[in-house]
């Protein structure tokens, strides 16, 4: 085998038919520049932003006692798995984008370790998102019952189980991934020149490729379908259902307060907080689907598509999907700090104090407070007594509250009957729900 001067040129073997055969199976040794340059740019950006954002999340949560909450405990675990996924996966992706695809330059152990760690950290991220969603679902929809199931000690056990389950689930991938070599074709077996193209008389020299074992197609399908169902389909169904339930509870919260007999006047700040929570919940579902669906679709196509019978157009679609899925796969980890933390005023304040420093933070909040006060003063109208508004308006301004009878302003007397106890319990529950939304 002759090594070409340009590393991206085809490998030249002693037999021309072998040269053509290898190229027909493995294709070009380097990614085309039209794909390599955008890949390097996007992967570099994701690596810098993702690692910085997730490390900031970890530092902010650790250094600020006000951030030591159950939700942030899950967020720190998620940030840890995302940092590991970015650090362990993206450098190798960058190397593959600017170097030859084959022969693989590293040992088989490194090949296995790379596949295992990438799969392991991605599983941990998905399961942590599920745990975080369960915690939010319980806290908002079942606030009284959530006190039984949510505690720091139990959260620690849950997070430990998440990492152990992810570790065990990723082990089969480590055993299935090997250094593959293109097997010798029938016309090259037991030929006088076979030793010139093969080291072992069975495979072609210089065709080492890190990937799942070519000869274990059934095992490939089992692992890929398992990952798709357990770590994408089921979490997607659960997350969507949980957040739809949360959205329904938040939208019905005002009417439930009104039916309970208690008058609640929602301020503009509380209304903005609720809208922010709704945006976060919708963004979580959309991000999960958008970032993970192309990756799993590409893997499913890779085990079901017969390249020998596929059209050139289908092949181009698959190649484009390969690059798109890689970008989406890692962008989920890079965007998690934004999706889970940027809408939280408490996190922004802690981030500014921890990362930017006290002086910059003081200037920022001083200007922000002045702008908010000016806006409030401009929007302030004549004061209308609350009782008069209750008599003359169907709703309380833009708060979309249900009509409130003037008699409800006198308070609600609860008797000892079972019916009144249930009403009182319901009122307490919705008070807790409303407080949860305000604290986000």
Model-predicted regions and their roles:
Residues 192-220, 228-231, 248-295:
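Intracellular effector-coupling site of seven-transmembrane GPCRs
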Residues 32-44, 67-134, 138-152:
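Extracellular TM2-ECL1-early TM3 structural module of rhodopsin-like
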Residues 43-46, 84-101, 115-118, 122-129, ...:
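Helix-to-loop junction signature of class
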Residues 63-73, 136-158, 240-280, 303-315, ...:
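Intracellular signaling interfaces of 7-transmembrane GPCRs
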Residues 51-62, 87-91, 120-144, 158-160, ...:
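Cytoplasm-facing ends of alpha-helical transmembrane segments in multi-pass membrane proteins
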Residues 19-29, 97-120, 148, 153-156, ...:
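Loop architecture of class A 7-transmembrane GPCRs
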Residues 41, 45-48, 77-80, 91, ...:
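Hydrophobic residues within alpha-helical transmembrane segments
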Residues 1-27, 182-204, 255-278, 311, ...:
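Intrinsically disordered regulatory tails of 7TM GPCRs
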């Amino acid at each position: 085998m002759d090594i070409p001067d340009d590393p991206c040129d085809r490998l030249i073997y002693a037999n021309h038919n072998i040269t053509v055969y290898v190229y027909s199976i493995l294709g070009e040794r380097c990614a085309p520049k039209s794909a390599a340059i955008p890949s390097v740019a996007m992967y570099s950006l994701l690596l810098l932003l993702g690692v910085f954002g997730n490390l900031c999340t970890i530092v902010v949560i650790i250094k600020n006692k006000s951030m030591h909450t159950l939700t942030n405990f899950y967020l720190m675990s998620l940030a840890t798995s995302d940092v590991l996924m970015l650090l362990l996966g993206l450098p190798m992706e960058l190397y593959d984008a600017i170097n030859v695809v084959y022969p693989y330059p590293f040992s088989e152990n490194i090949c296995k370790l790379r596949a295992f760690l990438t799969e392991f950290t991605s599983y941990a991220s998905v399961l942590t998102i599920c745990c975080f969603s369960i915690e939010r679902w319980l806290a908002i929809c079942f606030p009284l019952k959530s006190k039984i199931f949510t505690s720091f000690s139990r959260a620690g056990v849950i997070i430990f189980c998440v990492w152990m389950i992810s570790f065990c689930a990723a082990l089969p991938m480590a055993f299935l991934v090997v250094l593959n070599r293109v097997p010798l074709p029938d016309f090259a077996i037991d030929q006088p020149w076979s030793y010139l193209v093969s080291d072992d008389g069975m495979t072609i020299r210089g065709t080492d490729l890190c990937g799942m074992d070519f000869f274990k197609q059934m095992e490939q399908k089992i692992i890929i379908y398992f990952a798709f169902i357990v770590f994408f389909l089921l979490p997607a169904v659960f997350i969507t259902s949980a957040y739809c339930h949360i959205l329904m509870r938040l939208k019905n919260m005002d009417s439930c307060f009104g039916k309970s007999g208690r008058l609640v006047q929602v301020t503009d700040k509380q209304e903005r907080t609720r809208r922010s929570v709704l945006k976060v919940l919708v963004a979580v579902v959309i991000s999960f689907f958008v970032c993970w669906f192309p990756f799993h679709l590409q893997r499913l196509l890779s085990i079901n598509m017969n390249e020998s019978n596929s059209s050139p157009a289908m092949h181009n679609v698959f190649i484009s999907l390969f690059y798109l899925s890689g970008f989406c796969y890692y962008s989920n980890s890079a965007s998690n700090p934004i999706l889970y933390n940027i809408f939280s005023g408490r996190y922004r304040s802690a981030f500014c104090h921890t990362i930017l420093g006290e002086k910059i933070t003081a200037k920022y909040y001083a200007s922000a407070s002045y702008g908010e006060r000016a806006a409030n003063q401009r929007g302030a109208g004549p004061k209308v007594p609350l009782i008069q508004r209750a008599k003359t308006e169907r709703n309380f301004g833009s708060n979309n509250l249900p009509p409130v009878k003037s008699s409800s302003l006198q308070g609600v007397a609860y008797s000892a009957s079972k019916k009144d106890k249930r009403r009182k319990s319901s009122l307490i529950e919705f008070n807790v729900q409303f407080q949860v939304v305000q604290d986000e």
